Amino acid sequence: MEIANEKKIAGLVQFLRKGRTMTGRFRLPMLEEQAYEYLLAAYIMEVQLRYRRFIYNGFVEEQLKQVANCLTANTAKFGIVLCGGCGNGKTTMLKALQNLVRRLEILKPNLSPNAGHSSDNYYSFTIVNAMQIVQIRKTDYNKFCKLAEADILGIDDIGTEPAEVQDYGNFIYPIKELLAMLYDAQLFTVFTTNLEPKEIRQQYGDRIADRLNEMMTKVVYRNPTYRTENAQMADSQG
């Protein structure tokens, strides 16, 4: 179905847009293949920092390819969910992403290459644990709100926190609150969880689950844990 007076409507859209800005989608400034190589190197380094031997396998290859695509594709999505069982590399990937963004020193949108070397001109990447978010919400609401202003926010272990928390007689829902704020701000978010997609809906409700579907690309970790006794002796990467 076509819009009547399409040219006129387009002009009205431009008129109404004056003074409004679209939130830029964070992307790595490189092609997908190069992003894969950088991610692989960053991932290997995180494994080595844990005194483990990196083992390249099909699971890791597919996970890295999916994340590289998320970070370079021209899409409306502005986040990644790393979901799957315990100990299979999700937090390792999150930390690898954080280090990569920091090392690349990526300029924020609308800044020229001559903008200077102030840290405020480059994307930062903050990681916080879900349980820490609950505590921050209870003790420092201003700091809690600042989390929703981070250039890129990584939330580790969503689903391990209590669904509701009592604070001075009132029930609060810190993760649901923060996810709603991040959705409104449209800032890039990465989180890890052991929850299945249907469990995310059960824990946080239809409203948040639907918003997460709009915001984020799911990368499902299907490999078993790297934390078994044998893996700890040889190939652990979790």
Q: Which ranges hold each PLM region?
A:
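A short, basic N-terminal segment
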Residues: 1-76, 229-238
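Walker A (P-loop) ATP-phosphate-binding motif of ABC ATPase nucleotide-binding domains
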Residues: 79
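Hydrophobic anchor at the beta1->P-loop junction of P-loop NTPases
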Residues: 82
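Conserved glycine(s) of the Walker
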Residues: 87-90
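Hydrophobic positions on the alpha1 helix immediately C-terminal to the Walker A/P-loop
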Residues: 93, 97
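Walker A/P-loop NTP-binding motif
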Residues: 99-102
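Conserved nucleotide-sensing/catalytic segment adjacent to the nucleotide-binding pocket
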Residues: 112-183
